[in-house]
């Protein structure tokens, strides 16, 4: 309904739809045995609606997950036809493990950061494998505060554009910590995140990585998620057409 045609698919949703048990202790076994044909069916269903899955984010690539789950993540990404599997920045040992399976299956990995985002946060991941990329949330980068500013964000993108797989777009306030209500997530254009400047930089330099809408601000009364996603899309279009 929002006319979105390129998405990052969240694993928790698709796994539940395939019948993954709710018990965490049963999840590894399910992931080890689920047929990749199920993911090919998901790809087909989205393709029939004109939607491309450019990235898959399964919740099973952390330090406590088994090797078989990391391997599953790579296989599922390929079955979905996605360009990237995305996951959270993790420790060095786990990054090496992920890199091993990424190279084995020839899958690119986009690492996401929250408030630990900085100009050096991705250094180890990028050095560990040529298959490692940056999944940059520009709202989290600004909200982290400290040395992170609008100017450093734009420079970071310029300096690392060849290793960025995608951006998450949201408008957060500078130097605000994460909170349960997400009250510092603003309607686009009302926060401190330079969404406009980032989009224009992408346009100016013809960067080919994806910028995705991540709707996290409180939905205004009388509206809904679909309407707000459309507003965000129109915001982007207005910037790029200006």
Regions found by a protein language model. Name each.
Residues 13-14, 28-30, 59-63, 89-90, ...:
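Short histidine/acidic/glycine/proline-rich micro-motifs that form metal-
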Residues 28-54, 129, 195-198:
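Alpha-helix-loop-beta-strand connector modules within alpha/beta enzyme cores
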């Amino acid at each position: 309904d929002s006319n979105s045609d390129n998405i990052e698919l969240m694993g928790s949703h698709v796994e539940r739809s395939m019948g993954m048990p709710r018990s965490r202790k049963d999840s590894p076994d399910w992931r080890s045995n689920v047929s990749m044909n199920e993911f090919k069916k998901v790809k087909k269903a989205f393709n029939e609606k004109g939607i491309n899955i450019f990235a898959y984010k399964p919740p099973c690539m952390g330090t406590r997950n088994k090797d078989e789950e990391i391997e599953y993540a790579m296989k599922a990404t390929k079955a979905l036809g996605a360009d990237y599997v995305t996951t959270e920045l993790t420790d060095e040992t786990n990054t090496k493990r992920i890199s091993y399976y990424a190279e084995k299956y020839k899958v690119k990995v986009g690492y996401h950061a929250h408030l630990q985002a900085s100009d050096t946060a991705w250094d180890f991941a990028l050095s560990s494998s040529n298959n490692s990329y940056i999944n940059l949330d520009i709202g989290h980068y600004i909200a982290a505060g400290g040395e992170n500013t609008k100017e450093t964000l734009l420079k970071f993108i310029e300096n690392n554009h060849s290793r960025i797989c995608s951006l998450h777009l949201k408008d957060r306030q500078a130097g605000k910590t994460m909170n349960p209500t997400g009250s510092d997530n603003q309607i686009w254009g009302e926060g401190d995140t330079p969404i406009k400047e980032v989009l224009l930089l992408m346009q100016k330099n013809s960067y080919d990585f994806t910028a995705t809408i991540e709707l996290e601000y409180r939905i205004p009364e009388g509206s809904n998620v679909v309407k707000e996603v459309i507003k965000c899309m129109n915001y982007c279009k207005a910037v790029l057409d200006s």
